[in-house]
């Protein structure tokens, strides 16, 4: 995947992204509603096995700094059905980067991959739910 927006590039992860990804996954506050923060070795293992090996996620790169500031889970779970999720570097929260890059991935799913459904699950506070609504997602299920 390679998508460019005004301020972001969404692309596949590379091994060189380990330090930037660790700034995200190694931060206690960022990870508080997911799982315990990763040490650097666990970040590298996750990057290699899941992000690169299984192509289970894409990198959200800040154009101006060329820094990976976000991790976007993007998996096909059934024909035409994609799961997505996101975690962003805390230094870049509340500046519209998550919306801009996630919107681009959703648009890509519907226009290029002929998706008929893209969904996300929220386990944290209202931050993710608010973004989901802004992205046009609707509450479904319990």
What are the language-model segments listed below?
Residues 40-44, 52-53, 89-91, 121:
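Juxtamembrane/interface motifs at transmembrane-helix termini
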Residues 44-49, 54, 74, 132-133:
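Short amphipathic alpha-helical patches
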Residues 1-33, 61-142:
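Acyl-donor (CoA/ACP) binding surface of acyl/acetyltransferases
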Residues 29-49:
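Conserved GNAT-fold acetyl-CoA-binding loop/helix
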């Amino acid at each position: 995947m390679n998508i460019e927006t005004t301020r972001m590039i969404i692309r596949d992860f590379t091994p060189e992204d380990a330090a930037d990804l660790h700034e995200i996954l190694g931060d206690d506050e960022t990870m508080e509603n997911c799982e315990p923060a990763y040490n650097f070795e666990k970040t590298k293992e996750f990057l290699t096995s899941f992000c690169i090996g299984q192509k289970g996620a894409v990198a959200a790169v800040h154009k101006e700094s060329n820094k990976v500031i976000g991790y976007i889970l993007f998996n096909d779970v059934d024909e035409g059905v994609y799961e997505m999720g996101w975690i962003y570097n805390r230094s870049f929260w509340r500046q519209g980067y998550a919306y801009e890059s996630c919107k681009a991935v959703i648009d890509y799913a519907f226009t290029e991959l002929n998706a008929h459904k893209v969904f996300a699950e929220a386990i944290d506070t209202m931050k993710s739910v608010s973004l989901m609504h802004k992205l046009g997602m609707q509450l479904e299920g319990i």
